[in-house]
Regions:
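Structural preference for beta-rich elements and adjacent junctions enriched in aromatics
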Residues: 1-365, 371-375, 384-387, 804
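A generic structural micro-feature
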Residues: 18-20, 59, 304, 395, ...
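Generic structural hydrophobic/aromatic packing signal, biased to beta-strands
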Residues: 26-28, 37-39, 65-69, 81-83, ...
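Short coil turns and loop connectors of transmembrane beta-barrels in diderm outer membranes
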Residues: 33, 43, 75, 120, ...
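Short, glycine-/Ser/Thr-/acidic-enriched flexible segments
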Residues: 42-43, 72-74, 150-152, 196-200, ...
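Surface-exposed extracellular loop regions of Gram-negative outer-membrane beta-barrel proteins
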Residues: 185-234, 360-451, 509, 516, ...
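Alpha-helix capping and helix-loop boundary segments enriched in small/acidic/polar residues
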Residues: 210-211, 254, 302, 346-353, ...
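Exposed, low-structure sequence patches enriched in small/polar residues
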Residues: 307, 315, 415-417, 421-824
Length: 824
């Protein structure tokens, strides 16, 4: 390569193709071991450079330079490296031809970089070893190549090759890097052994508890092996995730599980190659989740999570444009220990069986338009042994998978995509009966005879399919339309995620946009969406109409306005296994205002409200502010406060032959007045680029008061017969429960009012003490208190969360990177 620097940059933002406000020069060199990049970023006022110091991959709010290589020249995958003006490194891997979607920040190669600010602006140097890149074996390399400089104080994004914002594609539009010759492709072998120790300290210690204050020490290892120039095996043995941030608190009154984000690095890295657009065949949080069973006794040592004995995955993309993702994992049998005071004995009970998982995903790219055809297969097997409590609860085997496709033309402007898949679960009739009665199916619905509920069934098979058409590019109008379905027997919740089967879903959307700056706005977008569902009985079970407006002002502030209308439909899940019930017409709006993305002090504010025709309502305030008082400090506060009344909250089902109008059962509902408030807080301090202290805390308070209890008057209606009228009685007892006398057998309802306080925090000292090697010191708190009061909580209760009883978790983990010379 010549001596002349690369400096012909142009704006992508704020004005596509515009002249840069500042000059940039980049030089590239290489030797047998590494590629070197030197850069000069000019600034007329160097004091304006944002240079916040943070941990690795945390430089989004600082001015930075990024280089991305498409080493296989496939127009789809890429390796990105960036350096901020403060010298903070960042890196990620692109698994798709998209700047943001499919970008994996968990990609952490070992490379070197430095930066310095001077009177002309700032300079940067990078050294990227060829061992950290995968590229084909060839005498002369030809790579896709892109440079990007981000100046947040100006909201200005400069690119060497300007990527059009009105069209699809990112990596496929890169320029070309040539001139690298005589470099050998290396198949890396990297080992990362670790040692960790942790201890739990309860706030209130019962000295008679033999399981008090447990302490553990363990060792494990991660490993990475290169296969050829395209594929990589990652393996982990006895992994430790003690440094991972805790999940947020909530009070879930629905019939459906809460889906939480995956934060464990082994499962997030390469995750894009283990999923498809559409069916959630694989939900990695299933591996190593909390045991399905629990035990009771005088003193109990209940495992918080199943132990992952080991896992391995194969990821990459071959020269023939075949993307490969495969994962194998095994969790060990989990035992809970119970100590009996009377017998002075400790017994052990199996609460989770040994379980094996397998996931395979292949996707072949076809033709010049980058159309794709792929397939996926997921399998799970549990060793239930001779444990009747396990066989009655859990399926022994589960399989799912299918094929998917995306046909593109006019360079991705138009596309038709779809999928077709299956599921199959096997197990004891009691376990399969639980699946049939679960919230995803409700086979037992008395008005759903076509569902064929069979309590003797020992397996369940179902299918899913979808077809979608999209216009993904163009200056002014984008649109999409989709129809999808899941049959009643479709079930993937052993390894994947499914909220509801037996649906025919439809979705149509159109967007009208302007990406060029105007007199008052930099850009704007209007969207209209209609979506909904029918079940296989022909009932319209869900409907939603939504209109949105997204505006970006000349000062880079943005305003989002959303209006939603949900027509009345017949819901097949509200009665939780009972007959269809009509929902009320509901409507609402959401307003969001955000500061400029590159502001030194960033903020956002939002308000949303909703109403329904049955007397329900919602009003919620939220927001956030991020303050950087100095380059080393960062403080973020995200307050939220919501008041609502749910007009049809399910309470319980009471069997009563006298309730002939509702198939011999009474389906009870109530109004619930709810208040929820929380304050997510983050405080980060960077001692240096390699030594950081990060703190996270979330005080959370919630309350709920049930009133207006009644029973569904008739199927396919929303009408309730309120207790205390029409010849019925309801009496509040001294313990808070209710004695109810309907027009039939009397019964008692427990007190469901609640006040919940929760405080979860996570403080992590992270020191990258050697290249690729890290020391973590972690302190976590998990405090919780609950009472059956139903008194509205307020912001003052957030202080009370810190005084609730709970546990302190202390952990120390040290890893050491051991590169083994790979073969070429």
């Amino acid at each position: 390569m010549g001596v002349a620097p690369l400096e012909d940059f142009n704006q992508q933002r704020p004005t596509e193709g515009g002249v840069p406000s500042e000059r940039t020069q980049v030089f590239i060199r290489y030797d047998n071991d590494a590629l070197y990049l030197g850069a000069r970023m000019f600034r007329a006022q160097p004091s304006d450079i944002l240079r916040s110091l943070s941990r690795r991959d945390g430089s989004a709010t600082a001015e930075h330079l990024q280089v991305t290589f498409d080493t296989h020249r496939d127009g789809r995958t890429g390796y990105a490296f960036k350096i901020s003006a403060a010298g903070v490194q960042g890196d990620f891997h692109h698994a798709q031809d998209n700047e943001m979607r499919g970008r994996e920040a968990q990609y952490d190669p070992v490379w070197e970089a430095s930066a310095a600010i001077d009177s002309l602006g700032w300079v940067a140097e990078m050294r990227i070893p060829f061992s950290q890149l995968r590229f084909p074996a060839a005498d002369r390399q030809e790579w896709g190549f892109q440079l990007d400089r981000w100046m947040p104080d100006k909201n200005e994004d400069l690119q060497w090759i300007v990527i059009p914002t009105k069209e699809t594609g990112y990596i496929s539009r890169f320029g070309t890097l040539t001139g690298i010759a005589g470099v050998k492709a290396v198949r890396p072998v990297e080992l990362l052994p670790y040692v960790a120790s942790d201890a739990v300290r309860a706030a209130v210690v019962d000295q008679a508890n033999p399981f008090r204050n447990p302490t553990r020490t363990r060792v494990g290892m991660d490993a990475k092996f290169g296969i050829g120039s395209n594929l990589t095996i990652d393996a982990t043995m006895n992994p430790d995730f003690g440094q991972v941030e805790a999940d947020p608190a909530e009070v879930n009154l629905s019939a459906f599980e809460t889906i939480v984000e995956e934060r464990r690095t082994f499962f997030t890295e390469g995750a894009q190659l283990l999923r498809i657009e559409g069916p959630n065949y694989f939900y990695s949080r299933r591996i190593g989740a909390a045991p399905h069973l629990s035990v009771s006794g005088d003193y109990v040592d209940q495992p918080r999570a199943s132990t992952i004995l080991g896992a391995a995955k194969l990821t990459g993309r071959t020269a023939s444009r075949l993307s490969v993702g495969a994962l194998l994992g095994m969790t060990g049998r989990a035992n809970a220990r119970v100590f009996s005071v009377d017998s002075n004995r400790t017994t052990s009970t199996v609460v989770e069986p040994r379980t094996e998982y397998a996931v395979v995903r292949l996707e072949q790219e076809l033709g010049k338009q980058a159309s794709t055809f792929g397939g996926m297969l997921v399998a799970m097997r549990r060793d239930l042994g001779s444990y009747p409590t396990l066989t009655a609860r859990l399926a022994s085997q589960a399989y799912s998978g299918g094929v998917d496709w995306r046909i593109r033309w006019q360079q991705g402007k138009y596309a038709v995509s779809g999928y077709a898949g299956f599921s199959h679960v096997e197990g004891d009739s009691l376990a399969i009966g639980r699946v049939q009665r679960s919230s995803a199916h409700y086979f037992q619905r008395p008005d759903g005879a076509y569902l064929d509920y069979d309590p003797s069934r020992q397996s369940l098979t179902g299918y899913t399919a979808s077809i979608r058409a999209d216009k993904d590019a163009g200056r002014r109008i984008l649109w999409g339309a989709q129809v999808s379905t899941e049959t009643s027997g479709y079930e993937v919740n052993d390894v994947g995620r499914l909220q509801s089967a037996e649906d025919v879903d439809y979705n149509a959307d159109i967007q009208i946009r302007e990406t060029e700056p105007g007199r008052y706005l930099r850009n704007w977008r209007l969207g209209f969406v209609s979506r909904g569902s029918f079940n296989y009985g022909g009932n319209h079970t869900n409907a939603e109409w939504q209109q949105s407006a997204n505006l970006t002002f000349l000062n880079f502030w943005s305003l989002n306005l959303n209006t939603r209308l949900d027509p009345s439909t017949l819901d097949d899940a509200l009665t939780r296994g009972g007959p269809l019930m009509r929902t009320g017409l509901s409507w609402g709006q959401d307003y969001r205002l955000n500061s400029a993305m590159g502001a030194r002090t960033g903020w956002r504010a939002n308000y949303n409200w909703g109403r329904d025709a049955l007397g329900g309502w919602r009003s919620a305030f939220g927001g956030g502010i991020t303050v950087r008082p100095s380059p080393r400090w960062q403080l973020s506060l995200d307050p939220n406060y919501q008041r609502s009344t749910d007009s049809r909250q399910y309470v319980t089902t009471v069997t009563d032959a006298a309730a002939t109008a509702t198939y011999g059962a009474r389906y009870l509902f109530a109004y619930v007045d709810r208040v929820t408030t929380s304050l997510k807080t983050r405080v980060n301090y960077a001692f240096s680029r390699s030594l950081t202290l990060e703190g996270y805390a979330e005080p959370f308070a919630a309350s709920g008061r049930y009133h207006g209890i009644g029973e569904l008057r008739a199927p396919r209606t929303s009408e309730l017969r309120r207790y205390g009228a029409e010849g019925t009685t309801i009496t509040r007892l001294a313990d808070g429960s209710y004695a109810v006398t309907p027009q039939g057998a009397a019964f008692t309802l427990s007190n469901r009012d609640f006040n919940v306080l929760s405080f979860r925090s996570n403080v992590v000292l992270r020191w990258e003490w050697h290249a690729g090697s890290t020391l973590y010191v972690v302190w976590q708190q998990n405090r919780r208190a609950s009472e059956a009061l139903g008194e509205p909580v307020s912001a003052a209760d957030l202080l009370n969360t810190t005084r609730a009883a709970g546990d302190n978790f202390l952990a120390l983990k040290m890893s050491y990177w051991l590169p083994v010379k790979g073969r070429s």
